[in-house]
Regions:
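RNase H-like, Mg2+-dependent phosphodiesterase core
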Residues: 1-206
Length: 206
């Protein structure tokens, strides 16, 4: 049980007077196709879903079930940054832009934010702390990781139907062997990130 995320960070903040705490996480920094997604989640301390964990440690079925529980009782917002925005401002800044959009979309304005990673978005004016491996340590960040991943996976499945052959329903845009082979055979789609090396190399090969 020690490996499961806890409510410890949130409890400490609540004891200091912070009543509305959002967990924030992103997904999709590594893919060569599709936008980057982020989720912001304010959990109800009286309704924390059982089994919350880092989304990468859960099966797709389990993620879906827990995401439905999160939606019932929590304030949830999804933000994204497009492939073109990723190309223009780089993936780190685009990830932070998606996080900012997710936070701004919450129904309630949080008075403290817990962010997965080691950097707080520079434009965020709300008090915040970055927690390395936060999705495995804080239930609020774990909830955000689940919501971000389930939302982005759904989008990539939809895009995969529009652009068959790349396997996006399975690889979510990550550079798997199937995806890279399809990139060579079928070419670059509007949803590929043109500044990412495998895509850039095909576009500008001699």
């Amino acid at each position: 049980m020690a490996d499961l995320p806890t409510y410890e960070y949130e409890e400490k903040l609540r004891s200091k007077g912070y009543s509305t705490i959002a967990g924030v996480d992103e997904v999709g920094r590594g893919p060569i196709a599709g936008p980057v997604y982020a989720a912001a989640v304010i959990l109800n301390p009286n309704h924390i879903p059982v089994g919350l964990n880092d989304s990468k440690k859960l099966s797709a079925k389990k993620r879906t079930l827990i995401s439905e529980e999160i939606m019932k009782h929590a304030d949830v917002s999804i933000g994204s940054a497009s492939e073109r925005e990723i190309e223009e401002i780089n993936i780190l800044r685009a990830s932070h832009l998606a996080m900012m959009r997710a936070i701004e979309g919450l129904k309630s304005t949080p008075n403290h934010v817990l962010i997965d990673g080691n950097l707080v978005p520079r434009d965020l004016t709300i008090p915040a702390i970055a927690i390395v491996r936060g999705d495995a340590r804080s239930v609020s960040i774990a909830a955000a990781s689940i919501m971000a991943k389930t939302s982005r996976d759904l989008l990539m499945c939809d895009l995969g139907q529009q652009f068959p052959g790349y396997g996006w329903d399975k690889n979510a845009g990550y550079p798997t062997k199937q995806h890279l082979n399809a990139l060579q055979d079928l070419g670059v789609t509007p949803h590929h990130r043109r500044t990412f090396k495998p895509v850039h190399n095909i576009l500008y090969q001699e």
